[in-house]
């Protein structure tokens, strides 16, 4: 199970359990997924005792129960909208990309050149982008427009890379996009006085997993 292995967190698979019940009404699949998540999380914690995600201080906002419900409903709405847009855009690009009348190696060179340009602006944003996400989670930048630009840059490049048919998946890039989206939402909430600065990483963690499931 990918989520527990990535975060060494057995309860991370509970998101996929909920999805299995809600979408497919498959209790057996849900139970199997939950057990797989517990085993995968245990094995990952045993083999890799040091997890970089453990350095993220996820401090829960000091809210009432009603305030937390409103927060989660807001995050659910934002994640659902952006997740749907991400899925639609990816499908459209996968249809358009093969129609580009250039040899395959030329298309690959285009992506390589774009990756080089991105690395000149922000080196850690290339690849999966998890190093950039971790740095933002531990020391969040407060410039919203810059984070929006980095998220859109990473999002567009990830969509074209995934649509190109190159080996590799979109698991880590999707997590990074969700985390950066969560950072943007959290920064807006900080400016509105709804949460504190130290709660940003908490919102980012929630949005990372939620965006992955939404997509």
Model-derived regions, located:
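Alpha-helical transmembrane segments and immediately membrane-proximal extracytoplasmic
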Residues: 1-215
